[in-house]
Amino acid sequence: MRSGKLINRKSYPLTRYGFICAVSRKESSSDLSLSLNEPLNINASKIKNSLGYIGLFQFGEAALIDLGYYKHWNANSDKTKANDWTGNWVGKNGINSLSDFLKSPSKQIQIIGQWIDFLCERLRNRNFNEYYGKIINGIEITESGAIAGAHLVGDGGLGSFLGVPGFKGNYKESDGNNVHISKYIDLFNYYDLESCCDRKIYILLRNQIGQIVKNKKLTIQSEYNGKFEQSKFTVDTESDDQGLLPVIIRACPHLKNWF
């Protein structure tokens, strides 16, 4: 099975859990291919950085508000957006405090799964999936890369980078450490997130006499007409060692917008 790009000298399979491991590796230097009881992972789950982001995946208050774990600032004693965590938690999934969150790496993994699904649906509802397959500044836009980028700077920053009308130039494309979203999109591309809808299908590549064609480089061209994006996309790709060629669907079947 193919792996993603190296992150702190480690790479992970291009699966949903591989994506979770890779994001955690980048955010907190953990290694979730090891037991959660490993000191490396225990320490990573308790991290709170200088900007107030917490845990294995460096969540901020806004993300945990979106997921229903931390009370919204409007209904909380914590009225700031500074990731100071001085307010009240909702109690969802047994997490009633910052301490509860930091001491439970297994629940943090559950939460990142919920976050992936949340962002997948949000990006679809905002038609950002129309940009999947497009090349921007030399980087192909994929679902996993886009979700990682939204985790870094929010969907506003992602929309700005993609050039979505109403977003372009109105949101920051870099985080508080000056990491640009393009780095995350490139680093976390091509993972199969296995959720939201079946984004990826596989085509078995055969030659004219029926032989399976393995590790064959080729170029795919497609046309798409959506709310924001009407264009032809060209992507260079390669069949794997079984002759399978991954094809990413830009939108869910029930939206009737196919690759």
Regions found by a protein language model. Name each.
Residues 199-209:
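A short, amphipathic beta-strand motif
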Residues 240-258:
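Short Pro-Gly-centered beta-turn/loop motif in secreted/extracellular proteins
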